[in-house]
Amino acid sequence: MEEVGLKRILQKLFQHKEIKPLCCVAIEAGPDRKREYGVAGKADYQGLGNRANFYSSFVLQELLPFLYKTYNNLTFTQISIAGFSLGGLSALDIAWKHPGVFEIAGIFSGSLWWRSVDMLDKTYSDDKHRIMHQQIRKGNFQPGLKFFFQCGNMDETEDRNNNGIIDSIDDTLDLIMELEAKGYDKNKDICYYEMPAGRHDMQTWGKAFPVFLKWAFGDKLKG
């Protein structure tokens, strides 16, 4: 997280009393992340994400218990999970499936295009084959769960439906619509942050991260 500038971001926000005290843990993205990240139990059409269930189990059964044990003198009132790109897809999937553990999901340039059928296949349909959208559609409203989505207008150049909007933004806005259809309030439960010059890189996510932290953990001490 050095490229994102996490330490500097946290120090500045704490100094200005813009966020509550928090414990922030970063998981290293390993060389097998294309298999470890994704939607647990549902690999994409290439077989990627086929180890997402193991990654989810690591977070829930190893990492969180370790943190509770290590910081047993602290009381955690709110737990969030966030990620960039494929990590954002994983964060959303894990939070969605474990709402009793996580209250907030942060998705930065999320790989919400994750699909069960190749888009070049003539049978492909956005409505049927985007995996995370289907997970939301088939799931249930979970009270208390909140979502932060960030996209950049320069995340990519692909526009598979030729509507003049890049796919990453289309996929994100469509997923937000799925959440709204479940009963989530777009003003109270969802934050969508679109960056005009945002790219698919650490520098962009570093600029977006303070926005997420203030939205998720904003403090009332200032002023």
Regions found by a protein language model. Name each.
Residues 1-223:
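Non-catalytic cap/lid and distal C-terminal segments of serine-dependent acyl enzymes
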